[in-house]
From Swiss-Prot:
The active site is at K208, R282. GO terms for molecular function: manganese ion binding; metalloaminopeptidase activity. Homohexamer. It comes from Vibrio parahaemolyticus serotype O3:K6 (strain RIMD 2210633). This is Peptidase B. Its main location: cytoplasm. It holds the Pfam family DUF3663. Binds 2 manganese ions per subunit. One of its GO terms (biological process) is proteolysis. It catalyses: Release of an N-terminal amino acid, Xaa, from a peptide or arylamide. Xaa is preferably Glu or Asp but may be other amino acids, including Leu, Met, His, Cys and Gln. GO terms for cellular component: cytoplasm.
Length: 432
């Protein structure tokens, strides 16, 4: 039978026998997290990981020092996809309790769907699960959703999604979700959110080695993150019309699969030569960005686990941000800072758009030359599919979406990082 442990916060140091600068101590009343001076949320998250690692399956956050942010930090560290520990806390104000429950609902959706196996989350299932989640958090009657799949993708001109997914036995899909709280079917679309939804990425014929393929069930992390962000924005009161567009496919090897040298002709007329089938995320996102541009929104945001280059630059602790719109980038970075999430700008300039030459098409899907800035040229590729790419477009390369192994703050698996930033950014832009 499991016994609940009370956990307290203290600014006092632990007794010497617990070790120098000990973070945790224990007594008959429970465990105490020793923060020292200040209110270090990172220390709280690390303590939660330690308690989970010690097999503490039920926790009550007790005492007077627990507030919204400290409870949230503990939840982030304590959550474990294998153990599902029980976490309870003392009463918060109604406003803080509502916010905490909204964060948990949105980020738990994101973490759970990214952690699921590729067998559980095929492209059509990803689109369906995302639509069901948004419907569950939105006011009744404000959400409509359409899933375009298989040969219908070709009929409607979504060549990139179809081409990437044609090597799989699992049907590719594009989710076209409309959140419209205005009650006016002719209301302008304020924002379009585009997510990369590669539910498993083998690399295709540019095959990944096993150690790089082992986490590729999480290559739909951009879709999971941006769906969670929209969900949290809705729970926080988003009052403008938003389209959610998820570009879902499985990148596999077969006799039907995309081959090097193939050329894709996109709906906007751009032709792309395939020089690496493992640079597939940008190929599906291109369709989503074209569809987004057709609605003339004020804001286009795409999220994708797009490049290893971003992860090499930033590790797991930051997402990368790229944009030609400096003012909007600053607002996104400010939103991340307010939400205490890691977001870091990487360069994106006009000359990056010239680093994708092809002898047979308008563009290659990879850059040429030695020491190519892979994250920047991937974003530059996407810019060819955003009608007004200089203004109102943000690209998130989600380096911090998933951890292959546990750290001192996180269990292995999805983090949910970026959900709060996206929600705040959407709501702040909508209120202007």
């Amino acid at each position: 039978m499991s016994t609940q442990m009370s956990v307290f916060l203290s600014q006092d140091s632990a007794a010497p026998h617990w070790g120098e600068k000990a973070l945790l101590s224990f007594s008959e009343t429970g465990a105490t997290i020793h923060l020292g001076e200040g209110h270090d949320l990172g220390a709280i998250q690390r303590a939660a990981r330690q308690l989970d690692g010690q097999g503490i399956h039920s926790v009550l956050l007790s005492g007077e020092h627990w507030d919204l942010e400290s409870i949230w930090a503990f939840h982030q560290g304590y959550r474990n996809p294998k153990k599902h520990g029980l976490l309870e806390w003392t009463a918060l104000s109604e406003e803080d309790q509502t916010e905490l429950q909204a964060r948990i609902k949105a980020t738990d959706f994101t973490r759970d769907i990214i952690n699921k196996t590729a067998e559980e989350v095929a492209p059509r299932q990803l689109a369906t699960m995302a639509a069901e989640f948004i419907k569950s958090v939105a006011p009744e009657g404000t959400v409509t959703a359409r899933i375009v799949k298989d040969k219908d993708l070709l009929a409607e001109g979504w060549e990139g999604i179809y081409a990437v997914g044609r090597g799989s036995d699992r049907t590719s899909a594009m989710l076209q979700l409309d959140y419209n709280p205005t009650g006016d079917e002719n209301a302008p679309v304020f924002a379009c959110l585009v997510g990369k939804g590669i539910t498993f990425d083998s690399g295709g014929y540019s095959l990944k080695p096993s150690n790089f393929m082992s986490a590729m069930k999480a290559d739909m992390g951009g879709s999971g993150t941006i769906t969670g962000g929209l969900g949290l924005a809705i729970l926080r009161g988003l009052n403008k019309r938003v389209k959610l567009i998820l570009c879902c496919a499985e990148n596999m090897v077969s006799g039907r699969a995309l081959k090097l040298g193939d050329i894709i002709t996109y709906k906007n007329g751009k032709t792309v030569e395939i020089m690496n089938t493992d640079a597939e995320g940008r190929l599906v996102l291109a369709d989503g960005l074209i569809y987004a541009s057709e609605h003339n929104p004020e804001l286009i945001i795409d999220c994708a686990t797009l490049t290893g280059a971003a992860k090499n630059a930033l590790g797991n602790d930051y997402h990368a941000l790229m944009s030609f719109d400096d003012e909007l980038s600053h607002q996104a970075l400010t939103a991340a800072n307010k939400e205490k999430e890691g977001l870091w700008p990487l360069p994106l300039a006009d000359f990056h758009r010239g680093m994708l030459p092809s002898n047979f098409a308008d563009l290659s899907n990879i850059s040429s030359g030695d020491y190519s800035p892979g994250a920047s040229t991937a974003a530059a590729f996407l810019s060819y599919f955003v009608e007004d790419y200089k203004k109102g477009w943000l690209h998130f390369d989600c380096a911090g979406t998933y951890r292959k192994s546990a750290s001192d703050k996180w269990a292995a698996g999805a983090t949910g990082m970026g959900v709060r930033t996206l929600a705040r950014l959407l709501n702040e832009q909508a209120e202007k």
